[in-house]
Each structure stands twice: as structure tokens, then as C-alpha cells.
Amino acid sequence: MDAILNFLRSTGFAQLFTGENWKCLVMIIIACVLLYLGIVKKFEPLLLVPIAIGMLMTNLPGANMFHEILYAGGEIHWSLFGGAPVTAEFLAELEAAGVSADVLSSVTVGQSISIGLVDILYLGIKLGIYPCLIFLGVGAMTDFGPLIANPKSLLLGAAAQLGIFMTFVGCRVLLHFTGAEAASVGIIGGADGPTAIFVTAMLAPALLGPIAVSAYSYMALVPVIQPPIMKALTTKKERQIEMKPLRTVSKREKILFPIVVMIFVSLLVPSAAPLICCLMLGNLLKECGVADRLSKTAQNELMNIVTIFLGVSVGATATGATFLSPKTLGILLMGVVAFGFGTAGGVLLAKLMNLFLKEKINPLIGAAGVSAVPMAARVAQKVGQQENPGNFLLMHAMGPNVAGVIGSAIAAGVLISLFG
């Protein structure tokens, strides 16, 4: 009988209703909501489904698949990975560094941690491996031809990064976030999930869960968030502007472009080099014509495997102690602000450029400067055709869209160099 009682006490069901474990129950419900959004509503399912499963894995009492203490204080504690026992001095250092009481109370002095599955997977995020590999795959799937054919669209991609810096200011002034936390929230405005994860893992790892969920949720809502802003900032006449077809881009230009960008951007913003180099390597594999096997692997098998690991690892950071806080609400709110300012920045710069250009550009393509590829470009096409059914803006919008990918990586490098 005692054996049965001991077994029942050891189950997750019994632990679920003891102490602070009610937070785990709330997080399990949130994970199920995300699964519903990903599977039924199809909101970024390739990321939301793994993220939700990661949430479930880390919030199941007794499963011990992820230990926050291994990464507490923003560092990797390799000695604990090697089986070293937790010491009183170690806990005192973490407490002085501001690590939450929930994390500190998860271990006891003298305890050796049994490394879990997600503990190992999370190393890929902490070391910056997964976001870079995602960028490798993105580069292999991206056609920079529209940007090369219309270099002016690079300015629109840069203007759309306004959302990042306006949100940074808002978080600092209104929500009193630290510089590193504000930078991590601001990067949501780039509409680039891997970049947001890359920056947050370096600057504010405690916020990784809510920021990743916010970034990918709002990316899925681009067709809902952008059109009202685009219509509010443009006139009917502006939305009807037709643009001439883009010139044909030569193979030589497509091969030289990733090489030149890799060198120039890496020298300009060294902190952005890992993301930019992987992005341009993937694109060079696609365009050079002699590495088709590598290009296809980067686009398919590698991208899919890394996406699973990335999603599960990010979801695992969303424990009740970190996710169920006022900061999460602030992050969700500022995420919308970031997307709004990013959209507005691109549209307003396009309108400004039209004051000086003989061949006018449709301001709607400025909204595609956020790097949600190709969703933002499709939104510009759809809104443009609502006003003028014969208008085809998709290829023109792809220029700012892919420029936004480069722009968000550069912005990430700037923020890391300032607050890293």
C-alpha cells in the first residue's frame, strides 16, 4: 500500500496541485491554445506547433526535461553539465545577479542535475546556431533579383526598421525595461522570428518565450495588422499607381550580390556577421548553379530539422515563472506597436520619395519592408489590386521585402553591439 501511495505522490498529477505548480497548469492551457491556433487556425503552424510542444514539455511537473538553472544569469554553466554539484556560493552569485527566486529554488545545495533532452537542444539557441542555420535556409529560398533590379527598394526595407527603434524607445520610457530587454522586444518590429530569437537569446534570455510567441503570432497576423495602416496613410490615387515591370537581372549580378553584401555588411556591423553570412551563403548556393544539392538540402531537410529544434527549444523557455508576468503583457502590446510603426515607416518613406522621383512608386510596397517574406509582399499586392484590379505589385514589393531581411539582421547587429 505504501508503495502505491509513494507512486501516486511521485506522479505529475499530484505535483500539479502543490506549491507554485499551478503556474504549470496555466502554461499547459496556453500551450494547448497555441496548438489550436497553429493546427486549426493555421497561424504560423511550422513554428507555433513545435513552440507549443516545447511549452508542454517544460511545464510537465516531474518530467525534468529543461533546467533553467543551467542557463541562469544569461550564461551557460558548463560545470553543471559536467555533473558538478550545486554550491551555496554558486546560488549566492546568481541571486546577486538578479536571477528569480523560482529558478534558484528549483535546485538545492549539493544536488547534481540530471541533464534533460531540452537542456541539450537549447544549446543551439544559446550558442546562436539555430537562427543562423534558419537564415542559411532562408537565403537558399530567397530571390534578391527584385532588390537588385530596383536598388531604391533597399531604402524602403531600411525605413521599415523604424518599428524596431520606436518600440525600443517605448519600452525604455513607458515600461521601464532595461536596454537589453527593450532591444529584444523592439526586434519584434522586424517581423523576423529567427532574428528576434538570436537577439533575445544573447541580450534577454529570460524573455525568449514571450518574445518568440509574440513575434510569430504577429507575423501570422500581418494580413490583418497591415491593411488598415496602409489605407490610413495613403490616398486612393496613390494606391492605384502602376509601376513599370522590373528589368531582367543577370546571373553575374545575382552571384556577385551575396558576396558583396556579405563583405560590406560584416565590415560595417560585425555583430550582424553570423546572420548575414549565413543568409548570403544560402543565397550563393542557390544562385551559383554548381551546388544544387547543398541548396536543396538547405531549403528542405536542414530547414525542417532546425525549425523543429528551434521551436521546441524556444517553447521550453516559457515556464510559468517567466511567462506569467506583467512583462509578458507589455511584450504582447509593444509587439503590435512594433509592427505598426514598421509598416508606417516603409509607407511614409515611399510617399516622401515620390516627391523627388519622376517615375512614382506605389507607397503600398513600402509596407512590405518588414521581413515577413513573402506575406508582407502578398498583402501589398492584395491591397493594390483592391483599388486597381490590373495592378501587379508583387515583384515590386518583393524588393523591399527581401531588403527587410537584410535590414533586420543589420538592426540586430547594431542592438547587440550596443547592449551585448
Summary of predicted features, one role per range:
Residues 1-20, 64-134, 201:
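Interfacial loop/helix-cap signal at membrane boundaries in integral membrane proteins
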Residues 34, 57, 124-148, 283-285, ...:
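Hydrophobic transmembrane alpha-helices of secondary-active transporters
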Residues 40-48, 66-67, 120-121, 141-156, ...:
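Interfacial helix-loop-helix linkers and transmembrane-helix boundary segments
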Residues 127, 135-141, 156-166, 177-206, ...:
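Alpha-helical membrane segments and immediately flanking helix-loop junctions
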Residues 147-168, 321-346, 397-401:
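Entry/N-cap segments of selected transmembrane alpha helices
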Residues 206-224, 334-342, 365-368:
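Alpha-helical transmembrane segments
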Residues 214-290:
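Membrane-embedded hairpin module used as a gating/binding unit in multi-pass transport
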Residues 262-346:
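Transmembrane helical segments that form the transport core of multi-pass membrane transport proteins
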